[in-house]
UniProtKB/Swiss-Prot annotation:
Matches recorded under PANTHER family: FMN-DEPENDENT ALPHA-HYDROXY ACID DEHYDROGENASE PB1A11.03, S -2-HYDROXY-ACID OXIDASE-RELATED
Binding-site residues for FMN, renumbered to this chain: S136, Q158, T188, K277, D332, S333, G334, V335, R336, G355, R356
Organism for this UniProt entry: Schizosaccharomyces pombe (strain 972 / ATCC 24843) (Fission yeast)
Swiss-Prot/TrEMBL cofactor(s): FMN
Keyword Repeat: no
Active site: H301
Family to which this protein belongs: Belongs to the FMN-dependent alpha-hydroxy acid dehydrogenase family.
Name of a matching Pfam family: FMN_dh
A Gene Ontology term for the protein's cellular component: nucleus
Signal peptide: none
Protein name, UniProt field: FMN-dependent alpha-hydroxy acid dehydrogenase PB1A11.03
Protein location: Cytoplasm; Nucleus
Domain FMN hydroxy acid dehydrogenase span(s) in chain numbering: 28-406
Sites where the protein binds a 2-oxocarboxylate: Y54, Y160, R197, R304
Length: 407
């Protein structure tokens, strides 16, 4: 399954703390703070204005984003005492596969605007730290180059779903994802058109429309798109990159949503697990079950798409209660610490996707910065659980009984 990769040959996350203190005895300090509250500010100061606006920016007046962040404070972990056990078991099982840790790197596009290493650096870090890496349709790096950088690591593919007029492009993207080792298909439902993003608009910056391959590399490297572009324009993609970028962006952000019946097309062309990302209410979650999906991600895209929305964490327990025994529920939006991860797992998520934090690590120190963020989050999670007397992330040990809802 994992291409001769010893998936469980991973360091105990808590060991990162010991490593840092040992280096401190030699007067060596971490290149990046271990305090996740400061990653964003440090990274934004390092980035260009356009890059900072893109990753930090949100829809509208940031209300959805703010609700995501505040929602975690509404739940508090209740510790248990005199629980004699080893370090907590952080392993989880999703889509029939056991993983050593309950996190994955969320799909984030255009990563070369944050650091020249781009997606290659991030996926290599995910492999080193034994967690799945989710390839974005908006990657600045091709499937094939990501496969080389990731090596034996676990990869999933996130699809920005072209309209039915471009099913041949969809099939080509899915085939390339399968050929390069992607096991799970994540279908993003909330981004058939980009949201109202003031920071990007104030900068006049849309990374998908620039005359380069950033954000549209999957298109520029796709044989079907390249063939169609040459037939239409009489030139190769490289000879008119501005038009090529505009056309591929229009294909993957078609401006209108698919409907539920269209999922049958994806099932026909993908033989692995299919997961719907962006499910935010119970009726839609039940529909996902009805249409035979293997999982959902409770997510509002980190507040980047729709303003005035409900926090993802607010909806998580309701959705888990409705469908958690019928498919795997994953979660993202607003996660910044080990305690945040613990709370999402306690509310029923089987795995938590990490987005902006690892991008900040990438901006600050490239691939090693991404590893640093992953190790900090997992170390923080393990200590949070251990000090709370919670022996594993399995539902029998980590559930709503360990949480108190603040008034």
């Amino acid at each position: 399954m994992f291409r001769n990769y010893n998936w469980f040959d991973a360091k105990e996350p808590i060991s990162y703390e010991s490593e840092i203190y040992a280096k401190g005895l030699k007067f060596q300090r971490p290149q990046i703070t271990v305090d996740g509250r400061h990653w964003e500010q440090l990274a934004v100061e390092r980035m260009t204005k356009d890059a900072a606006g893109y990753v930090y920016g949100c829809a509208g007046k940031r209300e959805t984003y703010d609700k995501n962040m505040e929602s975690f404070k509404k739940w508090s972990i209740i510790p248990n005492r005199l629980i004699k056990s080893g370090f907590p078991d952080l392993s989880t099982t999703v889509f029939g596969q056991k993983y050593p840790f309950p996190i994955a790197l969320a799909p984030v596009g255009v990563q070369k605007i944050f650091n020249p290493e781009g997606e290659s650096g991030s996926c290599a870090a995910a492999t080193r730290e034994h967690i799945p890496y989710i390839i974005s349709t908006a990657s600045a790096t091709s499937f094939e180059d990501i496969e080389k950088a990731s090596g034996p690591g676990e990869r999933w593919y996130q699809l920005y779903w072209p309209s039915n007029d471009h099913q041949d492009i969809t099939i080509s993207l899915l085939n390339r994802a399968k050929k390069t080792g992607c096991r799970v298909l994540i279908v993003t439902l909330d981004t058939f058109i980009l949201g109202w993003r003031p920071s990007d608009m104030d900068n006049g910056y849309d990374p998908f429309l620039n005359p380069d391959s950033i954000g549209v590399e999957h298109g520029f490297s796709d044989p079907v798109f390249r063939k169609q572009f040459k037939e239409k324009h009489g030139v190769e993609v490289e000879e008119n990159m501005l038009e090529a970028a505009k056309e591929f962006a229009g294909i993957v952000f078609p401006g209108i949503s698919h409907d539920w019946e269209d999922l049958k097309f994806l099932r026909k062309h993908w033989d692995g697990p299919i997961v719907l990302k962006g499910i935010m209410n119970v009726p839609d979650a039940k529909k996902a079950v009805e249409y035979g999906m293997q999982g959902i991600v409770v997510s509002n895209h980190g507040g980047r798409q729709q303003d005035g929305g409900v926090a993802s964490l607010t909806m998580l327990p309701k959705i888990v209660d409705a469908v958690g025994d019928k498919l795997d529920v994953l979660f993202d939006s607003g996660v910044r610490s080990g305690a945040d991860i613990a709370k999402a797992l306690a509310l029923g998520a089987k795995m938590v996707l990490i987005g902006r934090p690892y991008v900040y690590g990438l901006a600050l120190e490239g691939s090693s910065g991404v590893s640093h963020v992953i190790r900090c989050l997992l170390g923080d999670l393990e200590l949070t659980l251990h000090l709370s007397g919670i022996v594993s992330v399995k539902p029998k040990d980590l559930n709503r009984d360990v949480l108190y809802k603040e008034e």
